[in-house]
Curated annotation (Swiss-Prot):
Belongs to the TrpB family. The beta subunit is responsible for the synthesis of L-tryptophan from indole and L-serine. It comes from the Bacteria. The gene is trpB. One of its GO terms (cellular component) is cytoplasm. It comes from Parvibaculum lavamentivorans (strain DS-1 / DSM 13023 / NCIMB 13966). InterPro entries: Trp_synth_b_CS, Trp_synth_beta, Trp_synth_beta/beta-like, TrpB-like_PALP, TrpB-like_PALP_sf. This is Tryptophan synthase beta chain. Its cofactor is pyridoxal 5'-phosphate. The lineage of its organism: Bacteria, Pseudomonadati, Pseudomonadota, Alphaproteobacteria, Hyphomicrobiales. It catalyses: (1S,2R)-1-C-(indol-3-yl)glycerol 3-phosphate + L-serine = D-glyceraldehyde 3-phosphate + L-tryptophan + H2O. The modification N6-(pyridoxal phosphate)lysine is found at residue 98. Tetramer of two alpha and two beta chains. Its EC number is 4.2.1.20. Pfam families: PALP.
Length: 405
């Protein structure tokens, strides 16, 4: 469908990196030249067909794209309503969608002549994907990870070390993703000349939110093509989990100007929105500035960032990507939530009915699917982004279910 650019939901951000009132560049003076250099380098790379050709080659031969669009027939039968499809990004090399973005950014870092890579990680999937591309291209890699997340994601910590990365434990705050990102930003300020900060989600100062979205949009572009081949039409709805929101933005963005497609982002409701122990920034937060951009944040009356809670390390972030905040305000996407308990139930159901063990992150998206699927007509086509596999979560889930391993 052709849409006037001025009326398009896909035309952002503006030249200042804003999506409406969200986004922008709120960084220390020391970092501003780096962020501007990155913006310029990314614009040049986008205009160079050789850059995209290199990404396409690596996506095919190294990552294993395109990922399949899979009809979850037994789940569909179980609910007796909507036809449920999974976009199988958990089948990518390294087990999640994170590699899509890491590949694009590592190729950009090399173009810029950077010789050291740093990153933050929560669930460890972005850390593993970053360590993977650094190993592939022979670049040293430092990963910042909160001590709480290190404890609940031990397999991924070992994978990062095996891949040659240095994993730096972060003890400040609650030892989760927000704290890891703070430390990575401190490192970047101190090592401005040679270091590239490979941010893992659609947050941070401009151009990161747009750049990460662009590298992840392969998910939605493939889905659109695959759905037209399979069903001869676009899906009726899209569902994806939201931490910072890169897997969701990757699925949603190519469909934003297709008004017939309903879009649902699923935040982590933790112990319940009413308890205050959750990570649902849009449902329980307010606009503010964190990590270089203006967006919805969990904060107290004084504007101090509150610590969130989620069973899922990858959703345990007190903010959300600025483009999601804008889509929420414009009403183009609907943001809902799922609790720890609901995600655990969906995790088990998917494993038993489809033979697919999902990561706890997409288990939140599936939890929402389970709430609405049965009430939808049988010709309703729903696509859920299965953005990660659950190997990393089996120990944590066993613990929550009271199973001793």
């Amino acid at each position: 469908m052709s849409v006037n650019k001025a009326n398009s939901f896909r035309s952002g951000p503006d030249e200042r990196g804003r999506f409406g009132i969200f986004g922008g560049r709120f960084v220390a003076e020391t970092l501003m030249p780096l962020v501007l250099e990155l913006d310029k380098a990314y614009a040049a790379a986008k205009a160079d067909p050789a850059f995209q050709a290199e990404i396409d080659f690596m996506q095919r031969d190294y990552v294993g794209r395109p990922s399949p669009l899979y009809l979850a027939a037994r789940l569909t039968e179980h609910f007796g309503g909507a036809k449920i499809y999974f976009k199988r990004d958990e089948l990518n090399h390294t087990g999640s969608h994170k590699i899509n973005n890491c590949l694009g950014q590592i190729l950009l870092a090399r173009r810029m002549g950077k010789t050291r890579i740093i990153a933050e990680t929560g669930a460890g999937q972005h850390g593993v994907a970053t360590a993977t591309v650094c190993a592939r291209f022979g670049l040293p890699c430092v990963i910042y990870m909160g001590t709480t997340d290190i404890e609940r994601q031990k397999p991924n910590v070992f994978r990062m070390k095996l891949l040659g990365a240095e994993v730096v434990p972060v003890t400040s705050g609650t030892g989760t993703l927000k704290d890891a990102m703070n430390e990575a930003l401190r490192d970047w300020v101190t090592n401005v000349e040679n270091t590239y900060y490979l941010i893992g989600t659609v947050a941070g100062p401009h151009p990161y939110p747009a750049m990460v979205r662009d590298f992840q949009s392969v998910i939605g572009e493939e889905t659109k093509k695959q759905m037209l081949e399979r069903e001869g039409r676009l899906p009726d709805s899209l569902v994806a989990c939201i931490g910072g929101g890169s897997n969701a933005m990757g699925l949603f963005h190519p469909f934003l100007d297709d008004p017939s497609v309903k879009i649902y982002g699923v935040e982590a409701a933790g112990h319940g929105l009413e308890t205050g122990e959750h990570c649902a920034s849009l449902k329980g937060g307010a606009p503010g500035v964190l990590h270089g951009n203006r967006t919805y944040l969990l904060q107290d009356d004084d504007g101090q960032i509150k610590d969130g809670h989620s069973i899922s390390a990858g959703l345990d972030y007190p903010g959300i990507g600025p483009e999601h905040a804008w889509l929420h305000e414009t009403g183009r996407a609907e943001y809902v939530s799922a609790t720890d308990r609901e995600a655990l139930a969906a995790f088990q159901l998917c494993s038993k009915l489809e033979g697919i063990i999902p990561a706890l992150e997409p288990a939140h998206a599936l939890a929402f699917v389970t709430k609405i699927a049965s009430a939808l007509p049988k010709d309703h086509l729903m696509v859920m982004n299965m953005c990660g596999r659950g190997d990393k979560d089996v120990f944590a889930v066993a613990d929550h279910l009271g199973v001793t391993l």
